[in-house]
Amino acid sequence: MKTHFAIFLITLFLFQMFSQSDAIFKAIWSGIKRLCGKRGLSDLYDLDEMFDGEISQADIDFLKELMR
């Protein structure tokens, strides 16, 4: 009975390791395909628009309203 349980645990461990590595390989492959695609390299500059280094007077007024 102990042998069956040990074989079951080893099989369960190997199956879990295989299923997790498959998900990691899929994520890596999809990232490579996204970067090397036709529009993959041109989409990298989208993050630059998210940050605006200048704060306008309207932004300061809005923050003052929030802090009241």
Swiss-Prot record:
This protein's major location comes to secreted
Q: Give the family per the record.
A: Belongs to the non-disulfide-bridged peptide (NDBP) superfamily. Short antimicrobial peptide (group 4) family.
Q: Name one GO cellular component term.
A: extracellular region
Q: Which residues carry this modification: Cysteine amide?
A: 36
Q: Which organism is it from?
A: Heterometrus petersii (Asian forest scorpion)
Q: Does the keyword Coiled coil apply?
A: no
Know the name of this protein?
Answer: Peptide Hp1412
Tissue occurrence: Expressed by the venom gland.
